[in-house]
Amino acid sequence: MTKVMIVEDDPTLRDIYTTRFMAEGYDVVSASDGELALTTAVKEKPDLILLDIMMPKISGFDVLDILRATPETKDTKIIVMSALSQSADVERGKSLGANAYLVKSQVTLTEVVEKVKETLKS
């Protein structure tokens, strides 16, 4: 079963994403902050990570940078999901190695699921 990791500090959003991805047939693990995201990613080895940027302890940008530098996670597919919509933020995410960057206010849950499916195939 394909494993997706949801990294989101907002418990309501985390629950919504978790419920939807489980309904789509994915094995789902989650983390509520950047620090937990790093340890969970190495331990659980997800096929894809949905990564928030503005989080407690360690920002999503720093998490992304560390994941790409860690042998166990350097090739994991990562989609950034953030409220940050400035082009500089999008470029930073992509330059740090995100496979895609989605702005939360600009995508529906169905579009997020489709982007995950598309990214997993690539």
Describe the residue ranges of each PLM region.
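Conserved acidic carboxylate
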Residues: 8
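Two-component/phosphorelay signaling modules centered on CheY-like receiver
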Residues: 11-29
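Acidic catalytic/metal-coordinating carboxylates
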Residues: 33-36, 59-65
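As written
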Residues: 60, 69, 94-100
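Receiver (REC) domain active-site loop signature in two-component systems and cognate sites
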Residues: 55
